[in-house]
Amino acid sequence: MKALVIIDVQNDFMPTGSLPVKEGDQIIPFINAEMQKGYDLVVATQDWHPATHKSFASQHKSKKPFDVVQLNGIEQILWPDHCVQGTFGAQLHKDLDIRPISAIFRKGMNPEIDSYSAFFDNNKLNNTGLHGFLQDKSITELVFCGLAGDFCVAYSANDAKALGYKVSLFDKGIRSIN
């Protein structure tokens, strides 16, 4: 059984958002078309941070976006405030067809630790529930797309491999920060 996993296609990652991914909006038509290709399951994720999230540069005196700090023993890039719970920036982009999506998994809700992966927070102490959901649906193969390819998509794909899934990337549906 095969699932499409759509990572963080949210307003704040679009070209006009607070943490823009170049050409992030251009992947949406490709993802919408890909969802129609007979997957057994389609799921999505949302970055869903509290306003006081410690990955935000605004929460650290004399720090700016893209500075690097230690946060709970893990190297953390400080980001501009983005995908704050309940804001327009945290919403999935309006052009993403959400009808085929069976479930949306939110991540990054613990203000003390970031969560790039769709499966775990960055210290791997807490999970999002995605793995259990996929197991319940007998999913063994995952295809990833979304934003950003060099962070949340990559971390999610690597964790999926470590969890035993067969993993592939839908390249037309991915853009990266760097």
Description of each model-found segment:
Residues 1-4:
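Extreme N-terminal starter segment of soluble prokaryotic enzymes
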Residues 7, 46, 171:
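Active-site flanking residues adjacent to catalytic metal/cofactor-binding acidic residues
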Residues 10-16:
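Short acidic, Gly/Ser-rich segments with clustered Asp/Glu that frequently serve as metal-coordination loops
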Residues 11, 50, 110, 149, ...:
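Short, glycine/acidic-enriched loop or turn micro-motifs at the edges of active sites
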Residues 17-24, 118-122:
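Short glycine-enriched, charge-decorated loop/helix-capping segments at active-site entrances
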Residues 29-141:
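Active-site alpha/beta core segments
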Residues 34, 151-162:
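Histidine-anchored nucleotide/phosphate-binding helix
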Residues 143-146, 166-178:
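A short glycine-rich beta-strand->turn/loop micro-motif centered on a GG-aromatic cluster
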